[in-house]
C-alpha cells in the first residue's frame, strides 16, 4: 500500500493528504518513518529518474484518532479541539461532517513549461505523457480521461499473473504496471452486473501502460486482444449511447506531451448540503436520495456500450443476464468468470450489498482514517472471506467510494470551519475560489427553484387567507357601519327633538315678553300724553304773554314811523321771511330735544330688558311717535299764529295799516297750508306701509305654523318607517349572530392550527392592521364632513326662516342674525378641530435620514418572556402538552413562543416540561443590498457601540440583522491601491532576517496571495501611520454622500421632536424607577408582615402544645384515679371472699377442735418459728424502703433499675404472705379465733401500705422519666444544630484551604518521633475506652462535675493548644508540635473512667464521689495556672465533654451491648483519622518553624490554625498532590508583529480628519447644509472604523495562531501516548 501512495503522488493525479506541491512552502511538518522498499518514479522526461525515500511527509495537524470520525456510532472521549472564529461567509461554522477520507482539490490548467514544474502560477505541474488513454465512468461523471492509461488496467509482467487492476476514479490515483504486457481495460456495463477485467490473451481492449511511455486502448465487454507487448498500443473507439456525451476517436498509441486538468464531478440533481451523519441509517437515507440510479433495480441502464477493436480474437460471447434465474444462479466476480449453480442459496439484493460494502468501508476508515483503499482491495476482501456464495458488485463499491469523497469535499470547503487544519493557506486560496463558484453555480439554481415553489405556495395560502379575512372584515365593517349609522340617526332624532322643544319654549317666552312690552308701552304713552298736554298749556300761556308784549311794541313803532310808509313796507316784507325761518328753526330744535329725551328713555329700557331685537323695535316705535309729536307742535303753532292775526285785525280796524296786515296774514296762511299738506301726505304714506307690513307678518306667521305642522307629520311618518326598519334589521342581526355562533363553535377546534399560520403571517397582518386604521380614519373624516355639511344646511334653513319672520326692514335684527350664524359656524369648526386632535396626528415635518430611508421591520415572532426577536429560531409549546403532574395545560398558555436564551435558562413556568417545546428554525433569506446611508450608519454605530452588534443593527433601523452587519463590515474595502504593490517595496522595520527567510506562514514573505496577511505586515512595518490614505478615503466617502441631492440634513422640527422623545423616555424611566422602588418597599413590608404572621403562628403553636401537655397531664391524673378506684373495688371483693372463707373455716374448726386439742402441744413450736420469720421479713422490707428513698435522692439516672428491683421485692413479699396463709390452711393449724383475726388484720394493713408505696413510686418514676426525656431531646436538638453549623463553616474553610494544605503536604515529611508519641496517645485512648466500658454501670452525677486532665499524665514533649472551629484562633507558640482539643477531651474521659473504677470498688459510696470531685478540682487549678491562653475555651470544651459523658453513662446503665460495639467502631475510625491529620499538621508546623516562624504575619498564623482544624475530615493522598503540583507551561508569544501604537493615537486621528476636511474644501466649493463640525465627525468615524478593522484582523490572527499552537500540543500528546 505504501508503494501505491508514493507512486500516486508522483504520477500527477490529485495529491493525497499530507503531500504538498513543490511550489508551496508548507508549515514545518513532523515526519514519520516507515520501512518499505524503494521505488522509482518517472517525470515528464523519460531519461530522468528520482529515487523516493522511505520517509513520507505527513502533516501532524491531519492525524486523527479513529474514534473521532463522525461516522463512528460510539466515539471515545477525546479532548476538544479549539474552534476557529468565522469563515468567509460571516457565519459560525459547524464541524466537519466526515473526516474519513482526505479532501481532494481541483487543479487548474498548466500554464508554465513542462520542464519547469516549480512555477508559482499553478499548484501541480502535469507533464506526464498521455497516449490513447482509456475512458471510464464514475457515478457522477460521464467520462474520465485518465492520465497514463486512465481507465485502462494493468498487469504485472514479471509473473504474468491474472490479476488485473481496474481504472482510476476522480479522486484516487491510477494503478499501473511496472512493465511488460498491460491488461485489458474496463468498460462500462449495466449497474446490476459486474465488470469484466481482461487478460493478456483473452478479453480486453488495447494494452496498458509500459514504462509510462505509451497509452493503451479502450476496454469493452467484448473486444479484441490489445497489442500491449510492444511500445505502441492500438486503441479503439467508443460511443456512449445512453449518456449525454459522445466521445469518439480516442487517440491511439502515439505519445504526446501535454497537460490536461482533472475534470470535476457533476453534482447530482437536487443535492442539499450535508448534515452530520449520526448513524449508518442516516447515511443510507441520504444515499437513496442522492444515488437514484443505483437503487432503481428495474429501470437501470449502463452509461454506455463500448466496441473496441484489437488484433486478438474473441474467446467470450456476451451473456444475457436477464435470462439467468436468481433462484438458481449466483456468481462471483473475479479475474476469471466462473458461474456456480447453487439452487438452495439465493442472490442478495443491491441495497443489502450496498450496505455491506458501505459498512466495510466505514469500519476500515475508522480503524485507519487516512489509509489508501482501492476498489480491488475491497473486492478481494469479500472474495476471500465469502468464497461460497456472495455477489461482489464492483460498481457498487465505486459508488460508495466516490460518494463518501464527494460529500467530504463539500463539507470541507463549503460547510466547514476546520479547512485550515487540513489544507495549507496557499492551497486554500485556490480551493476557495473554485468551491465558491462551485457552490454558487450548482446549488443556487436549485435553491431558487425551491424558494420559488415555496414562495408560490405561500402566496396562494396568503391569498386564500387574505380573501377569507377580507370577507370577514367586510362583514364586520358593514355591521359596524350599520350600527354607527343607527346610532347617528338616533342622536340626530334626539337633537331635533331637543331643538324643537327649545324653539317652542323660546316662542312662548317671546310671546309673553311681547305682551308685557305692549302693556308697558301703552302705559308709557298715556303718561307721555298727559305730560305733553301740561307742557302745551304752559307754552300757550307764555306765548300769549309774549305776543301781547310784541303788539305793544309794534303799536309804538307804528306810531313813530307812520310817516315812513314806504320804508316800513319793505321792512315788513323781510320780517315775514325771517319769521318763517325762525318758526322752522324752533320746530327743529323742539324735535331734537324730544328725540334726545326719547333716546335716553330707550337706553334705560335696553338695560332693563337685555334683548337687542326688542330694543330696535322700541327705537323705531319711538321715532315714529316723535315725528307725530313734532307735526302736532307745528300745527298748534300755526293755529296760534292765525288766532293772533285775527285779534290784531280786530284791534287795528280803526288804524290805516289794516290792509297791510291782511296781506301779510294771507301770505302766511298760504305758506302754512302748503307745509301742512306735505306733512299729511307723508303721514298717509307711512300709515299705509305699516298696515302692509302688519298684514305680511301675520300671513308669514300663519304660513310658518302650517309648515311646522306639516314637518311634524312628515317626521312622525319617517320615525315610524325607521322603527320598522330597525326592527327588521334587529331580526336579521339576530339570525346572523346565531349563524356566527354556530360557525365559531365549529371553528374553535381549528383555532389552534390557525394560530401557527397566523404567527407566520405576522408581517402581513401588521400591514393590514395599518391599512385598516387608515381606512377607519378616512371614513371618520368623510362622516364628519358630511355631518358638518348637514349642519350648515340646517343653519341656513333656520336663518332663512328667521329672516322671513323678522322682516327685511329690520336692519338691526339682520345684522345680529348674521353674527349668530358666524358664532355657530366657529363653534362647529372648533369641535371638528378637537376631534382631529384626538386622532393620531400625521407628521408633516421632514423626517430624519433614518426615518425617511430606513423602515424598521417588525419581527415575525417575539419572545413571550423577554420580548426579543426570535423569528429565525424559536421554541413553541406543543398543543395538548402535559405538566409535571400529568394534567393537560389549559388553553390560555397557547401559543407560547420562547427564544433560545429563555429556553436554555429555563425562563418559563416551572410546571412545564422542556420536552413539550418544539424547536422551529426559519432562516430568512439574506438581503444583500446595502445603501450608502446604511453603510454610513453602520460605521457610526461601530464607533459608538463598538462590539455590540445588536445595538448597531438597531441604530441602523432594524432592517439588517447583527450577522449581516458583521459580514458587511468585514467585506468593506480597507485600501485597494496598496494591495497592488509588492510587499518587498515597503520597509521591513524591526523584523529580523530569520523571520523573513524562514518558512513561517505568518512571515511577510510567506503567503503573498493572502491580502489580510499582507495588510497586517504592511501596517505593522510602517514607522508612522498613513494619515493621507485614511484622509483621502474618508473624503471620498463623504463627498459622495454630500453631493447626492437625496440626502439632506433633518430639520429643526425633527430634532426638537427627537429631543422631546428622549425627554419622554427619561421621564418614563424615572417613573419606572419610582414604581420599582415602591414595589420593593411593598415587598419589604409584605415580608415583614409575613415574618410577623410566622411569629404569631409559632406562638399559637406553643400555646397549643402547652394546652396539649395540660390535657395529657389531666388524662394521666384521670387514669390514676380510675386505677385507684379499681384497686379499691378489688380490695373489697378480696375482703368479702376472705370473710366467706373464714366462716367456712370456723365451721370446720369447730368440728375439728376436738381432734386438734391433742396435737396442740406439738404445733405450738411450729407457730413460734413462723412468727419469727414473718417479723424478719417485715424488717427487711422497711430497710429496703429506706434504701430506695436514699437512692432516689442520690441519682436520677438509676430510677428505672430501682423500680424494677422494688417491684420484684414487692411481688416476692406478697407471694410469701400468700404462701404462709396457704401453708396454714394446708397444715390445718389450729389457731384460736382471736389470733386468726389479728393475723388477718395485720396482713390486710400490710398489703394496703405496700400498694400505696408502689403507686407513689410508679408516679414519681413516670414523671421523672418524662423530664429526663425532654431534657435529652433538647440537648440532642442543640447538638444537631451546632454540628450542622460547624459542618457548613468547615466546608467553606476546607474549600479555601485545600490548595494550601495540599502544597504543604507535598513538601512535608513525617518524623518518626512524633509518630511514636501519637501512637502512644492512641493506645492510651483505647485503654481508656475499655475502662469506660467496664465502668458503664457506675452511677455518677457528671453534671455537677468538671473533669480535667493532669499535665503530669501527658507526654512532656507535646504541649497542648486548643483552636475550636467556632471560636477565634490564637497564635501558634514557639514549640514544634501541637495537639488538638479532641485529645484533651478523651484524656479527660480516661481519668474519669479511672475514678469510676475506684468508686465501683468501694461500693459507690457518696463519700468517695466527693473525694473524686475534690481531686478533679485540684487538677483544674493546676491546668489553669499552666495554660494562660484560652481558659474559657477549655472550660467550655470540658463542659461539653462532660455533658456528652452524662449521655454515655445513661446509655451504659441500660446495658445495651449492641450500641457499645457500634460506638467503639466509630470512635476507632475517628481516632485513626485524627492521627493521620495530626501527623500531617506536625510536619507542616515543623517546616514553618525551621524556615522562619517569626517572618510570618498574624494573618498567616490564623489561616494555618483554621486549616489544622478543617483538615481533620479531609483524607488526601499523595497521588492527587502530584498531579496538582504540575505547573502549566509558560504561554508562547505570538509570531505576528504587533501594530504600531502610534497608529491608534488621538493625534493621528485628528491629523487624518484635518487633511480630509481640507481635501473636501478644495475639491468641492458648494455650500452644504451640514456644519463643519458635523463633517469632521463623519470623517472621524470613517477613520476610526478603518483602524478598528485592522485591529480586529490582528486579534483574529492572534487567536488563530494560538489555536494552531494548542492543536499542535494536543496532537503531540496523542502521538506520544500512541507510541508509548
UniProtKB/Swiss-Prot annotation:
Query: Which regions are flagged for Acidic residues bias?
Result: 498-511, 799-834, 1467-1481, 1493-1504
Q: Polar residues bias located where?
A: 1-13, 1338-1350
Specify the SWIRM domain's residue ranges: 310-421
Q: Where is this region: Disordered?
A: 1-57, 176-204, 294-318, 450-849, 1049-1506
UniProt cross-references to CDD domains, sorted A to Z: SANT
Compositional bias, Gly residues, is annotated for 177-187
Localization per record: Nucleus
InterPro entries attached to this UniProt entry = Homeodomain-like_sf, SANT/Myb, SANT_dom, SWIRM, WH-like_DNA-bd_sf
Nucleus listed as a keyword: yes
Task: Report what the protein is called.
Answer: Myb-like protein X
Q: What is the species of this protein?
A: Dictyostelium discoideum
Amino acid at each position: 500500500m505504501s508503494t501505491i501512495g508514493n507512486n500516486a503522488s508522483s504520477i500527477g493525479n490529485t495529491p493525497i493528504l499530507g503531500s504538498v506541491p513543490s511550489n508551496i512552502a508548507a508549515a514545518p511538518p513532523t515526519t514519520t518513518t516507515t520501512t518499505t522498499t524503494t521505488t522509482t518514479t518517472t517525470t515528464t522526461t523519460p531519461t530522468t529518474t528520482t529515487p523516493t525515500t522511505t520517509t513520507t511527509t505527513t502533516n501532524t495537524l491531519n492525524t486523527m484518532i479513529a474514534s473521532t470520525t463522525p461516522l463512528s456510532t460510539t466515539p471515545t472521549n477525546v479532548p476538544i479541539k479549539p474552534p476557529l472564529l468565522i469563515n468567509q461567509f460571516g457565519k459560525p461554522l459547524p464541524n466537519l461532517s466526515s473526516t474519513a477520507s482526505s479532501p481532494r482539490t481541483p487543479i487548474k490548467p498548466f500554464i508554465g513549461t513542462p520542464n519547469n514544474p516549480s512555477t508559482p502560477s499553478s499548484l501541480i505541474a502535469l507533464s506526464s505523457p498521455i497516449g490513447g488513454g482509456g475512458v471510464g465512468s464514475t457515478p457522477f461523471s460521464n467520462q474520465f480521461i485518465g492520465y497514463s492509461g486512465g481507465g485502462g488496467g494493468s498487469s504485472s509482467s514479471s509473473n504474468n499473473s491474472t490479476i488485473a487492476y481496474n481504472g482510476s476514479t476522480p479522486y484516487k490515483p491510477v494503478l499501473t504496471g511496472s512493465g511488460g504486457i498491460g491488461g485489458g481495460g474496463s468498460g462500462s456495463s449495466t449497474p446490476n452486473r459486474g465488470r469484466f477485467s481482461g487478460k493478456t490473451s483473452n478479453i480486453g481492449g488495447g494494452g496498458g501502460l509500459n514504462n509510462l511511455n505509451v497509452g493503451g486502448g479502450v476496454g469493452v465487454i467484448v473486444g479484441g486482444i490489445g497489442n500491449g507487448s510492444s511500445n505502441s498500443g492500438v486503441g479503439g473507439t467508443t460511443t456512449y449511447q445512453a449518456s449525454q456525451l459522445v466521445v469518439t476517436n480516442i487517440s491511439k498509441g502515439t505519445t504526446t506531451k501535454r497537460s490536461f486538468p482533472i475534470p470535476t464531478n457533476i453534482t447530482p440533481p437536487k443535492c442539499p448540503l450535508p448534515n452530520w451523519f449520526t448513524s449508518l441509517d442516516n447515511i443510507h437515507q441520504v444515499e437513496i436520495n442522492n444515488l437514484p440510479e443505483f437503487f432503481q433495480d428495474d429501470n437501470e441502464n449502463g452509461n454506455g456500450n463500448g466496441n473496441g477493436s484489437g488484433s486478438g480474437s474473441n474467446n467470450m460471447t456476451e451473456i444475457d443476464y436477464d435470462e439467468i434465474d436468481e433462484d438458481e444462479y449466483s456468481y462471483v466476480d473475479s479475474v476469471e468468470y466462473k458461474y456456480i449453480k447453487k439452487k438452495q442459496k439465493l442472490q442478495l439484493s443491491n441495497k443489502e450489498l450496498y450496505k455491506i460494502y458501505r459498512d466495510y468501508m466505514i469500519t476500515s476508515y475508522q480503524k485507519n482514517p487516512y489509509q489508501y483503499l482501492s476498489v480491488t482491495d475491497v473486492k478481494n476482501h469479500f472474495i476471500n472471506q465469502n468464497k461460497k456464495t456472495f455477489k461482489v458488485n464492483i460498481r457498487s463499491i465505486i459508488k460508495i467510494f466516490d460518494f463518501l469523497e464527494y460529500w467530504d469535499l463539500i463539507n470541507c470547503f463549503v460547510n466547514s470551519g476546520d479547512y485550515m487544519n487540513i489544507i495549507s493557506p496557499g492551497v486554500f486560496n485556490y480551493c476557495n475560489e473554485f468551491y465558491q463558484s462551485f457552490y454558487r453555480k450548482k446549488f443556487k439554481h436549485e435553491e431558487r427553484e425551491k424558494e420559488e415553489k415555496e414562495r408560490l405556495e405561500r402566496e396562494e395560502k396568503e391569498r386564500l387567507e387574505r380573501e377569507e379575512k377580507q370577507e370577514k372584515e367586510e362583514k364586520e365593517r358593514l355591521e359596524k357601519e350599520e350600527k354607527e349609522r343607527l346610532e347617528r340617526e338616533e342622536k340626530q332624532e334626539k337633537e331635533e327633538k331637543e331643538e324643537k322643544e327649545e324653539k317652542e319654549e323660546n316662542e312662548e317666552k317671546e310671546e309673553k315678553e311681547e305682551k308685557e312690552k305692549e302693556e308697558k308701552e301703552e302705559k308709557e304713552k298715556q303718561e307721555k300724553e298727559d305730560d305733553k298736554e301740561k307742557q302745551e298749556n304752559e307754552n300757550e300761556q307764555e306765548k300769549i304773554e309774549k305776543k301781547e308784549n310784541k303788539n305793544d311794541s309794534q303799536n309804538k313803532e307804528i306810531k313813530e314811523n307812520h310817516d315812513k310808509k314806504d320804508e316800513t313796507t319793505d321792512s315788513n316784507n323781510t320780517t315775514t321771511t325771517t319769521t318763517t325761518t325762525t318758526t322752522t328753526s324752533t320746530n327743529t330744535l323742539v324735535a331734537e330735544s324730544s328725540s334726545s329725551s326719547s333716546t335716553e328713555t330707550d337706553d334705560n329700557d335696553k338695560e332693563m330688558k337685555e334683548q337687542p331685537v326688542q330694543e330696535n323695535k322700541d327705537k323705531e316705535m319711538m321715532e315714529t311717535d316723535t315725528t307725530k309729536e313734532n307735526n302736532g307742535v307745528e300745527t298748534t303753532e300755526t293755529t296760534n299764529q292765525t288766532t293772533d292775526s285775527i285779534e290784531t285785525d280786530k284791534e287795528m280796524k280803526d288804524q290805516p295799516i289794516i290792509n297791510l296786515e291782511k296781506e301779510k296774514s294771507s301770505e302766511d296762511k298760504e305758506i302754512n297750508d302748503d307745509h301742512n299738506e306735505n306733512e299729511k301726505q307723508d303721514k298717509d304714506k307711512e300709515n299705509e306701509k305699516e298696515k302692509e307690513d302688519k298684514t305680511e307678518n301675520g300671513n308669514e306667521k300663519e304660513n310658518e305654523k302650517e309648515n311646522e305642522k306639516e314637518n311634524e307629520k312628515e317626521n312622525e311618518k319617517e320615525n315610524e318607517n325607521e322603527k320598522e326598519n330597525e326592527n327588521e334589521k334587529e331580526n336579521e342581526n339576530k339570525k346572523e349572530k346565531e349563524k356566527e355562533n354556530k360557525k365559531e363553535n365549529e371553528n374553535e377546534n381549528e383555532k389552534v392550527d390557525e394560530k401557527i399560520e397566523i404567527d407566520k403571517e405576522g408581517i402581513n397582518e401588521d400591514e393590514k392592521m395599518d391599512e385598516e386604521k387608515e381606512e377607519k380614519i378616512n371614513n371618520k373624516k368623510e362622516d364628519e364632513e358630511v355631518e358638518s355639511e348637514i349642519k350648515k344646511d340646517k343653519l341656513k334653513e333656520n336663518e332663512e326662516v328667521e329672516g322671513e319672520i323678522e322682516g327685511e326692514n329690520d336692519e338691526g335684527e339682520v345684522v345680529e342674525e348674521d353674527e349668530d350664524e358666524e358664532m355657530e359656524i366657529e363653534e362647529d369648526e372648533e369641535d371638528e378641530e378637537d376631534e382631529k386632535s384626538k386622532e393620531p396626528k400625521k407628521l408633516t415635518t421632514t423626517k430624519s435620514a433614518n426615518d425617511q430611508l430606513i423602515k424598521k421591520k417588525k419581527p415575525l415572532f417575539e419572545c413571550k418572556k423577554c420580548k426579543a426577536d426570535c423569528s429565525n429560531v424559536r421554541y413553541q409549546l406543543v398543543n395538548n402538552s402535559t405538566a409535571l403532574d400529568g394534567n393537560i395545560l389549559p388553553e390560555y398558555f397557547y401559543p407560547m413562543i420562547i427564544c433560545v436564551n429563555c429556553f436554555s435558562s429555563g425562563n418559563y413556568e416551572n410546571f412545564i416540561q422542556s420536552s413539550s417545546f418544539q424547536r422551529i428554525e426559519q432562516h430568512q433569506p439574506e438581503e444583500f443590498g446595502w445603501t450608502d446611508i446604511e453603510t454610513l450608519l453602520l460605521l457610526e454605530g461601530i464607533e459608538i457601540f463598538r462590539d455590540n452588534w445588536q445595538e448597531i443593527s438597531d441604530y441602523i433601523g432594524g432592517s439588517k440583522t447583527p450577522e449581516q452587519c458583521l459580514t458587511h463590515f468585514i467585506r468593506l474595502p480597507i485600501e485597494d491601491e496598496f494591495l497592488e504593490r509588492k510587499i518587498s517595496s515597503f520597509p521591513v522595520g524591526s523584523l529580523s532576517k530569520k523571520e523573513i527567510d524562514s518558512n513561517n506562514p505568518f512571515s511577510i514573505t510567506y503567503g503573498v496571495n493572502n491580502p489580510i496577511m499582507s495588510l497586517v505586515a504592511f501596517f505593522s512595518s510602517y514607522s508612522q501611520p498613513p494619515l493621507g490614505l485614511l484622509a483621502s478615503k474618508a473624503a471620498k466617502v463623504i463627498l459622495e454622500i454630500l453631493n447626492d441631492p437625496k440626502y439632506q440634513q433633518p430639520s429643526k422640527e425633527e430634532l426638537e421632536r427627537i429631543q422631546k422623545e428622549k425627554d419622554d423616555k427619561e421621564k418614563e424611566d424615572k417613573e419606572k424607577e419610582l414604581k420599582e422602588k415602591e414595589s420593593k418597599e411593598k415587598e419589604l413590608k409584605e415580608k415583614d408582615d409575613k415574618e410577623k404572621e410566622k411569629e404569631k403562628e409559632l406562638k399559637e403553636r406553643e400555646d397549643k402544645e402547652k394546652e396539649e401537655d395540660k390535657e395529657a397531664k389531666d388524662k394521666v391524673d384521670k387514669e390514676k384515679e380510675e386505677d385507684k378506684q379499681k384497686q379499691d373495688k378489688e380490695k373489697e371483693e378480696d375482703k368479702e371472699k376472705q370473710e366467706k372463707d373464714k366462716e367456712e373455716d370456723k365451721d370446720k374448726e369447730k368440728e375439728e377442735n376436738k381432734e386438734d386439742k391433742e396435737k396442740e402441744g406439738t404445733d405450738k413450736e411450729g407457730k413460734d418459728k413462723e412468727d419469727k420469720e414473718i417479723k424478719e421479713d417485715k424488717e427487711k422490707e422497711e430497710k429496703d424502703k429506706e434504701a430506695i428513698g436514699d437512692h432516689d435522692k442520690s441519682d436520677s439516672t438509676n430510677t428505672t433499675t430501682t423500680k424494677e428491683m422494688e417491684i420484684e421485692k414487692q411481688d416476692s413479699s406478697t407471694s410469701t404472705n400468700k404462701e404462709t396463709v396457704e401453708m396454714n390452711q394446708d397444715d390445718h393449724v389450729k389457731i384460736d379465733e382471736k389470733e386468726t383475726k389479728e393475723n388477718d388484720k395485720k396482713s390486710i394493713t400490710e398489703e394496703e401500705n405496700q400498694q400505696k408505696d408502689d403507686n407513689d413510686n410508679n408516679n414519681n418514676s413516670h414523671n421523672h422519666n418524662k423530664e429526663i426525656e425532654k431534657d435529652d431531646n433538647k440537648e440532642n436538638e442543640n447538638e444537631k444544630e451546632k454540628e450542622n453549623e460547624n459542618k457548613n463553616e468547615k466546608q467553606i474553610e476546607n474549600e479555601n484551604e485545600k490548595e494550601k494544605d495540599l502544597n504543604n503536604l507535598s513538601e512535608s515529611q513525617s518524623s518518626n518521633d512524633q509518630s511514636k508519641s501519637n501512637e502512644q496517645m492512641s493506645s492510651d485512648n483505647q485503654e481508656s475506652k475499655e475502662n469506660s466500658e467496664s465502668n458503664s454501670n457506675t452511677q455518677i452525677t457528671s453534671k455537677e462535675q468538671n473533669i480535667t486532665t493532669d499535665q503530669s499524665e501527658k507526654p512532656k514533649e507535646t504541649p497542648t493548644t486548643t483552636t475550636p472551629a467556632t471560636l477565634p484562633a490564637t497564635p501558634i507558640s514557639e514549640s514544634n508540635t501541637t495537639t488538638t482539643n479532641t485529645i484533651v477531651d478523651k484524656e479527660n474521659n480516661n481519668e474519669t473512667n479511672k475514678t469510676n473504677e475506684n468508686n465501683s470498688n468501694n461500693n459507690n459510696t457518696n463519700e468517695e464521689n466527693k473525694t473524686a470531685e475534690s481531686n478533679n478540682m485540684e487538677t483544674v487549678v493546676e491546668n489553669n495556672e499552666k495554660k494562660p491562653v484560652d481558659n474559657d475555651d477549655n472550660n467550655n470544651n470540658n463542659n461539653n465533654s462532660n455533658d456528652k459523658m452524662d449521655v454515655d453513662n445513661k446509655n451504659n446503665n441500660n446495658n445495651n451491648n449492641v450500641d457499645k460495639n457500634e460506638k467503639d467502631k466509630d470512635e476507632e475510625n475517628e481516632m485513626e483519622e485524627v492521627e493521620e491529620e495530626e501527623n500531617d499538621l506536625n510536619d507542616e508546623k515543623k517546616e514553618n518553624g525551621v524556615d522562619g516562624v517569626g517572618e510570618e504575619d498574624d494573618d498567616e498564623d490564623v489561616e494555618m490554625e483554621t486549616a489544622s482544624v478543617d483538615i481533620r475530615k479531609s483524607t488526601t493522598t499523595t497521588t492527587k498532590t502530584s498531579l496538582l503540583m504540575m505547573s502549566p507551561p509558560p504561554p508562547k508569544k505570538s509570531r505576528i508583529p504587533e501594530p504600531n501604537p502610534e497608529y491608534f493615537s488621538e493625534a493621528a486621528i485628528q491629523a487624518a480628519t484635518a487633511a480630509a476636511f481640507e481635501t473636501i474644501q478644495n475639491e468641492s466649493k458648494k455650500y452644504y447644509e451640514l456644519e463643519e463640525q458635523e463633517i469632521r465627525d463623519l470623517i472621524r468615524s470613517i477613520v476610526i472604523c478603518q483602524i478598528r478593522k485592522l485591529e480586529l484582523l490582528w486579534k483574529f490572527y492572534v487567536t488563530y495562531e494560538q489555536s494552531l499552537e494548542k492543536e499542535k500540543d494536543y496532537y503531540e500528546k496523542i502521538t506520544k501516548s500512541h507510541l508509548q
